[in-house]
Amino acid sequence: FPTEESTLKEHQTDVVIACFGMGESFDGEAGLANFKTDLKAFVASHKGKQYNGESEVRLILVSPIAYEDLGELTPKVASRNRDLKRYTQAMKTVAAREKIPFVDLYEPSKALMAISESNPLTTNGIHLSGYGYWAVSRILYDRFIENVPGNKKWQLTIDAKAKKGEGDGLSVSKISSSRRAISFQVTEESSPSLAPPTDRELPAALAQRRDSMTVKNLQPGKY
């Protein structure tokens, strides 16, 4: 790893996704000015560079998640989240001035953490759990891919009696059914999503993004 620039050129980098703010936020309000200065310098160091030899590298800034309240394990939750919110806002301001994309993970993660009976997103308030990685990856995917054609969740409906089906995000054909089996063929029109690593009920904001399949008018029996 000789230098950052030489490594990015070696990899012919097209996009740099830069996550800042969690560690820096421990400097509190007093560290905000330096944080903004350093962030502007980081952006300036990459702007205009053609690491792939053809096009200017694209920068995306990503904020930290919120600090999760896990009881005695996570003291000073209110003050930590005040600082994290300040640093998230600072990143948003710099991104707007530099005209580069910005993804706010603080607000959506805080909203998920506030839901009672929800799965914990972190193991210690900061580091994501397996479920947390799944949930945050959904947020990132939606922000990165929003408004792109084909960015649809899979919704498949099969009418076993009529042998008809319809889909969103995929197309369905060759439907057949009997007392023991139902079969059909699907063609992907968008990417499938990974199942959550939990059997517990998901918050509505995440549940509505799940792929789903509904089979109607299925005769009783084992299939």
Identify the residue ranges that each predicted region occupies.
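Surface-exposed alpha-helical segments enriched in charged/polar residues
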Residues: 9, 44, 48, 89-96, ...
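Conserved catalytic region of serine esterases and O-acyltransferases that act on ester linkages
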Residues: 97, 119-223
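Extracellular serine-dependent O-acyl
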Residues: 55-65, 81-119, 134-158, 221
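Generic, low-specificity signal for short hydrophobic/alpha-helical stretches with a mild N-terminal bias
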Residues: 73, 77, 84, 118-122, ...
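Conserved SGNH/GDSL esterase-like catalytic core that processes O-acyl groups on lipids
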Residues: 1-45, 51-58, 63-76, 163-178, ...
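Soluble non-cytosolic domains of exported or imported proteins
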Residues: 2, 29-37, 78-86, 126-135
